[in-house]
């Protein structure tokens, strides 16, 4: 990490940090993965499977890798806390894994209708992902808020992905996706 800015507000010095390069960003996210999941042995396998699935637009493999990933997080990570009840936990695990791949991802991607939980931008495709804990239809939120319209002029395949988690199961219970038809372009 490098110091981006020093702020002196009379009470204390504050430091704004930045990641100097892609290698440091990947290494830092690997540390987050280790902290959030205790999966140091399987981490590379999960990273490779996620990357392969995304580059091949294979959302069934993406789903099965995520299910296996969450199944392998030790139960004691959930003991004496209620972390499994929060969308932020699940999205943070997925974010850390995807960020460790060195691909472009945007958390809380702002649109004119709200925020996309996670956008993945690859050379050939864009994935718009919404996470929910419980039964609310994540995919329908993406569709109803027309989040894909932000990327229609990018000339890439666009995939909408809704992922639901169950706090008792501590895993994915619903995974729906849809490819946006590229018949309409915004001017």
Residue ranges of predicted features:
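Extended alpha-helical interface modules used as scaffolds for assembling large macromolecular complexes
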Residues: 1-135, 140, 144-146, 157, ...
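Short catalytic/binding micro-motifs of nucleotide second-messenger systems
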Residues: 148-151
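Conserved RecA-like P-loop NTPase helicase motor core
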Residues: 153-155
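Extended hydrophobic secondary-structure segments that form protein cores and membrane-embedded regions
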Residues: 159-164
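Short, internal active-site loops enriched in acidic
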Residues: 165-169
């Amino acid at each position: 990490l490098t110091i981006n800015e020093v702020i002196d507000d009379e009470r204390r010095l504050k430091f704004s940090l930045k990641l100097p390069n892609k290698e440091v960003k990947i290494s830092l996210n690997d540390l987050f993965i280790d902290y959030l999941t205790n999966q140091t042995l399987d981490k590379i396998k999960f990273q490779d499977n996620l990357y392969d699935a995304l580059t091949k637009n294979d959302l069934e493999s993406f789903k099965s890798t995520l299910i296996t990933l969450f199944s392998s997080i030790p139960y004691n990570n959930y003991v004496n806390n209620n972390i499994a009840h929060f969308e932020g936990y699940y999205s943070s695990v997925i974010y850390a894994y995807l960020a460790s791949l060195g691909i472009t991802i945007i958390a809380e991607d702002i649109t004119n209708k709200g925020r996309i939980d996670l956008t993945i931008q690859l050379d050939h495709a864009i994935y718009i992902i919404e996470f929910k804990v419980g039964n609310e239809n994540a995919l329908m939120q993406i569709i109803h808020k027309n989040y894909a319209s932000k990327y229609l002029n990018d000339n890439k395949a666009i995939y909408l992905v809704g992922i639901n988690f169950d706090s008792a199961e501590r895993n994915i219970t619903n995974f729906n996706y849809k490819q946006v038809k590229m018949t309409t372009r915004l001017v």
